[in-house]
Amino acid sequence: MKKKSFSIVIAGGGSTFTPGIVLMLLDHLEEFPIRKLKLYDNDKERQDRIAGACDVFIREKAPDIEFAATTDPEEAFTDVDFVMAHIRVGKYAMRALDEQIPLKYGVVGQETCGPGGIAYGMRSIGGVLEILDYMEKYSPDAWMLNYSNPAAIVAEATRRLRPNSKILNICDMPVGIEDRMAQILGLSSRKEMKVRYYGLNHFGWWTSIQDQEGNDLMPKLKEHVSQYGYIPKTEAEAVEASWNDTFAKARDVQAADPDTLPNTYLQYYLFPDDMVKKSNPNHTRANEVMEGREAFIFSQCDMITREQSSENSEIKIDDHASYIVDLARAIAYNTGERMLLIVENNGAIANFDPTAMVEVPCIVGSNGPEPITVGTIPQFQKGLMEQQVSVEKLTVEAWAEKSFQKLWQALILSKTVPNARVARLILEDLVEANKDFWPELDQSPTRIS
Amino acid sequence: MKKKSFSIVIAGGGSTFTPGIVLMLLDHLEEFPIRKLKLYDNDKERQDRIAGACDVFIREKAPDIEFAATTDPEEAFTDVDFVMAHIRVGKYAMRALDEQIPLKYGVVGQETCGPGGIAYGMRSIGGVLEILDYMEKYSPDAWMLNYSNPAAIVAEATRRLRPNSKILNICDMPVGIEDRMAQILGLSSRKEMKVRYYGLNHFGWWTSIQDQEGNDLMPKLKEHVSQYGYIPKTEAEAVEASWNDTFAKARDVQAADPDTLPNTYLQYYLFPDDMVKKSNPNHTRANEVMEGREAFIFSQCDMITREQSSENSEIKIDDHASYIVDLARAIAYNTGERMLLIVENNGAIANFDPTAMVEVPCIVGSNGPEPITVGTIPQFQKGLMEQQVSVEKLTVEAWAEKSFQKLWQALILSKTVPNARVARLILEDLVEANKDFWPELDQSPTRIS
Amino acid sequence: MKKKSFSIVIAGGGSTFTPGIVLMLLDHLEEFPIRKLKLYDNDKERQDRIAGACDVFIREKAPDIEFAATTDPEEAFTDVDFVMAHIRVGKYAMRALDEQIPLKYGVVGQETCGPGGIAYGMRSIGGVLEILDYMEKYSPDAWMLNYSNPAAIVAEATRRLRPNSKILNICDMPVGIEDRMAQILGLSSRKEMKVRYYGLNHFGWWTSIQDQEGNDLMPKLKEHVSQYGYIPKTEAEAVEASWNDTFAKARDVQAADPDTLPNTYLQYYLFPDDMVKKSNPNHTRANEVMEGREAFIFSQCDMITREQSSENSEIKIDDHASYIVDLARAIAYNTGERMLLIVENNGAIANFDPTAMVEVPCIVGSNGPEPITVGTIPQFQKGLMEQQVSVEKLTVEAWAEKSFQKLWQALILSKTVPNARVARLILEDLVEANKDFWPELDQSPTRIS
Amino acid sequence: MKKKSFSIVIAGGGSTFTPGIVLMLLDHLEEFPIRKLKLYDNDKERQDRIAGACDVFIREKAPDIEFAATTDPEEAFTDVDFVMAHIRVGKYAMRALDEQIPLKYGVVGQETCGPGGIAYGMRSIGGVLEILDYMEKYSPDAWMLNYSNPAAIVAEATRRLRPNSKILNICDMPVGIEDRMAQILGLSSRKEMKVRYYGLNHFGWWTSIQDQEGNDLMPKLKEHVSQYGYIPKTEAEAVEASWNDTFAKARDVQAADPDTLPNTYLQYYLFPDDMVKKSNPNHTRANEVMEGREAFIFSQCDMITREQSSENSEIKIDDHASYIVDLARAIAYNTGERMLLIVENNGAIANFDPTAMVEVPCIVGSNGPEPITVGTIPQFQKGLMEQQVSVEKLTVEAWAEKSFQKLWQALILSKTVPNARVARLILEDLVEANKDFWPELDQSPTRIS
């Protein structure tokens, strides 16, 4: 019986990630056949440049796939099985401000952690809800596979504001780290590992890693990580310097709890000062990306569109993103794949807020994710996670209630922010910088000396 | 690489189930190779009659397996990978009293439900702990696969009194009912179904059943069960009348909650009067088994031992018990099989006592079971389960504290017992009947008029 | 400074309790000055006969109090500080059916316990919500002091359907039993006792009783109750036979848990058979009341109205109801009185459903009740209470969702109902009997053989 | 009937607080009669200088009180009704190091908050347990009234390591702040206020303050505090500059949550930088106290002992400490006084760790404290409190398990410590400084770059 083929819309078509993901989808048509692929964005000019290249890729590799790029929600979201969402409200320009404003006050300036993540979240909530509503309006049976950042705040927002929506929140960081673990262990693929992991998004720990036979791989990994972090002795693939620092820093982050292996983003919470020291407040990661990947991708796309051929294209298949296909297939074919998803806790972590959105192993089938219980977590992780989940929940409360006070409280609570005064100064700058993107907040009744 | 082969001891070697299970093990040597098989029992005379036949089976079908039957704990439990426990403290004679005493007062008289289950539990706790202690003394790395009844009370006792023991509590009733569901659905095996189920042992509900592609099979099953119970239109295999009544009664039990499919044992709690009406206080199920299966198995074993051949044997392979092999393989080879096990709740059912032993789907690997979260259960099931788990916990508290009062409270709480007076009368009879098996209870300070 | 005086409306003016309560209010004007007293009922003819007498009482004892009896909600609920609610939807006639229908099937027939309480609850919810809405419409700052039965179901309904309403649910049974305890102990008033108590309404236990100096009075009380129940050696006041049986039966109920002293209503759950045995299905307590108190009160009221004098009145001050004044004063004057109220659990009982309405000691002030924590309750009480609270919650869910199925589940769960079939038969009779009072339930999809 | 009089031992007799407290006790003999007063300390030389003066006070004011100062536990703790504990293990010298070491790294250096509190806690646990064990050995019916700091860590330690001990943990900070609130409101005493408050010790918030009639005093207080902090317009009593800064800083701390009024210690967590800025790493509060109060008290005591008269004594009655008498009287006479105590949460705060030691209003009687439920707390306070309670619990776990790793985790988690590296550096210095007082910790397996 010929496998059913699917209709996909990529929300955030103008993203620099779109070409690599389209190539990845075209590379997995065997397992995941596609009949229709659409790009949707609210920035027509930007999306058309990306779409030009994707059109060439598809005509060359799978001409029978119906392809369209549109800014019309009805066209984009009608007759769709899956929405693959990687939107970035405010694009890199706003990300630069997210990073630079905190650094002005000596505070971590990062895309999803600390004040930057809060600012980015306050922009993203409206965007993700909008797309979710389009999906439910035009394709009520569709699923949204959301890997838009900051996933933690977006996931809490969809839990609170769209509790019954068919949205799966997933993050690629654990995938990337597990790829490195596999290299460190000499395995051919991370899929040879069975892992137990828990935390919030960008804020978690591996507690058990076995091979297929059930042998415990943690001792070997811990031994390696305690010396080299997540840098394999022989790098399969060269990475940018800043990523290399991150994987090396895992060494110190792991020292804080030798019983586990940490998600690398914890560096921003446990060693914020080190992060600030190596940041340039006037030229942050966002600037690197704009000058690096964004420039590269758009120049390549223009060239492919111009030459109506991908022959000279240097754009690589983003196979690292194949977890999106795994997730889509799990829903489509009830595969029961074991994947880390961001889901409502509801008892999975026994001694943690049942309404928190936690990142835990799930068995994914056509009915969605079945979280696997974690049990009780140690006090160190509970203390860190309760603090951080309160930041995320207060941010969503602030967005929903247009509350300056609650957003200030979110910043005060963040482990990356040293005190309430700096929190207030950063917030006032962020309000100003985001006035075109955030809901208008009520005026805080309180001043501090 | 030649698969590792295992050493097994069957605790309760003298059980009538042993021959069928040994035949089943011999039928599954391909997937689960065995190097040594021992029977252990504290009733030498009874075990030797069973062992005689098993010896013949093994010599005929797998002569290289080292076989022994012993009443010496050290011999039995040394160099063992798995203990397969199906003990019955007090044998069928006491089960007959468990059933007859309550019936004397018009109350359900059943092996594991109501006062009978409480009495049986009070006998079994000591027996299971004893075996567990032998295992940990002589083979500290071994696992106990316990399907001794009453599994709910035994599981609560091991949780409370041996919290760190490597014991897996499992029950074959859901396996049996799922076999029938598969027949009703026209599937070749229950393993083609992916199920979601929750409850206490002998006290649970299926909430979702899909085929491999994720299609919802519940509507079809509910339609069938609401008319015929768990009786397929064409019975694959004739069953005893009393089992047939049970599978038919599922029809009425299911009516109490049309959203789910019930475990058949719920009939004793929702329709106790019907159960009592069709029981004969002087000739209960235990008597049927003694006159039926027990007599049959022992005569067959004597014959096989006499003829030193299984040629004329009518003892069938108990393939229904192959779930035991599935469980052993999951531990041995880290298969990650999805099975219903009785595990500590600890958040799996979000709105239920975290310390309750609940029967839920688990992913089973070499580290043991990983329960899959159930989420929040409806008020009807919560009310029934909280009442019943209190019966089970009070029984274990009564055993541990030798408390007549707590055992009376357990009986008062049972849905099968109409009032505190009858609970008291039954308890006093059971105390008398079990004085050789139960711990000696303190004298209750209270009388009732 | 002259104490503020209050405006009261008694909802359920036509109740036989109204005259005694009015006399009690007039007897407590010193502590609780009243400027305006209104009676409200939806049965004008019945209320006018009661109002006639009350008019005489007020003119004789406190002529400056403005008095009115009305069936007009706006008039009744405008300019009101307190609504004192003792409504009985369906009056005694329906209560008779509540009691007789279950008895037909050998099941407890009682006003607030078992099927009778469920039926009464299904009538009362709408009535209490209606009054609450009138109060909030016409006197938004007022408080409703609700002692309408069945208080447990009414309290759960107001929690779920009017979560922010200023309603205090209180019951007089503990007050009555504590009065008797005081007599047993030789104290002049129950107010010399400091008690710790927990449970659901009509379903609780005293765990600690001290005198003012902190001496433990439990041993002496337990000693007495274990022999005589709640019957003091010398009765201060003769009670009706049925009440006497109830207070005597406490002896057996207490035996089920010698560590506590029980609420007498537990007799219907622990000794339902004894209750049924002494009931006459054709002449229940409701009939006794109609023939007894109801006839007496209305004849007395007619006489007082006729004679325009209370001189020959035999209607007594209902000082037992002075707890209503205590509660009103606590709100009015922020007295911080310690009283048993029915409040949302929310942690008061640590190991019990946080959304359950539980009866626990509270400190009552102008902001309402502050529940005192109970801590963790034993397994016996938890099992009983979880079962019973599920009955109450399912009844309110059934009312809100018009669900025949959920009401059947409520009856199945009740400890007083022996099995699902009898539950179904009783339900079908009750549906028929209450078609003028209950919401119209959907048709249950299920039949049982 | 002549009131019973009591035997008291003050543990930490050599404390500078002892004279003021003894004078306070002598000033309250009417409400709390004392027959025997003993001082106990393990520093004889220091205690004798204090005892000399106390001996004079007692002979002058209540000669019939039996007085003794001893370093012998049996003598001190025999025939005792109450142990009043204000011990300081390591005295002010170690407190100076607690404050100076963190300041070396730009981190808050304070007696009970941040690294200083953790270091002080690691010294105090052993000391308080020792005294508790003496009390239970020699006067098993006695109660310990503990106001030794750091009360939060000491309370968690006694909860975990002595769960059944009769110890009441109380703190005087809320008392001091409520005194100031009363002045701000123009009330004669804080006892005219009924408060609702929750938090951890030195980490809480007032949520409701009423006068006796139930009028809401919060608006007026919030208005004042948002401008002047806790500084009344006319100071009843001049305070030291550092205390004045603290009460003024409440203004900024309150801005973080305008719905509540904060405990002043929150300044160290919300404005750590401001605290560090005004600290002199070489001359901290401990030095001020040694040079100030300690020198003053010991010189005064020497003079009183020399002159065998208190005539020229400038030592004031520490009436601020009369809360200790209130607490003792509540136990002794079952007064049911409403006081803030540090008790096991166990549901009092519904959405917070049930095993946390929380500071909440309690009704105190002869059976000990009955916590009043708080209900659910907002996300901001929950985030802050979960982080801080994890610091406290990890400190006690580190003490009990002699774990360097867990103590490092406690420091990492503290909101006052900027990152894991500084946490590590501070810890290594504190280990060195406290080697005579802390248990010897295992060596951490981990290093950081």
Curated annotation (Swiss-Prot), chains A, B, C, D:
Q: Give GO terms for biological process.
A: carbohydrate metabolic process
Chain residues that bind NAD(+): 6-72
> Catalysed reaction per UniProt?
alpha-maltose 6'-phosphate + H2O = D-glucose 6-phosphate + D-glucose
The UniProt record lists the EC number as 3.2.1.122
Which residues bear the site annotation Increases basicity of active site Tyr? 111
Keyword Iron belongs to the record? yes
Q: Which GO terms describe its molecular function?
A: hydrolase activity, hydrolyzing O-glycosyl compounds; maltose-6'-phosphate glucosidase activity; metal ion binding; oxidoreductase activity, acting on the CH-OH group of donors, NAD or NADP as acceptor
- Miscellaneous information on this protein: Reaction proceeds via a redox-elimination-addition mechanism consistent with an E1cb-type mechanism. This includes redox steps involving NAD(+) and stabilization of intermediates by Mn(2+). Because it hydrolyzes 6-phospho-alpha-glucopyranosides without activated leaving groups (such as maltose-6'-phosphate) but not glycosidic linkage of naturally occurring phospho-beta-glucosides such as cellobiose-6'-phosphate nor methyl 6-phospho-beta-D-glucopyranoside, GlvA is certainly more appropriately classified as a 6-phospho-alpha-glucosidase than as a 6-phospho-beta-glucosidase. The ability to hydrolyze beta-glycosidic linkages is exceptional and applies only to activated 6-phospho-beta-D-glucopyranosides.
Entry similarity comment: Belongs to the glycosyl hydrolase 4 family.
What is the name listed in the Swiss-Prot or TrEMBL entry for this protein? Maltose-6'-phosphate glucosidase
Per the UniProt record, the source organism is Bacillus subtilis (strain 168)
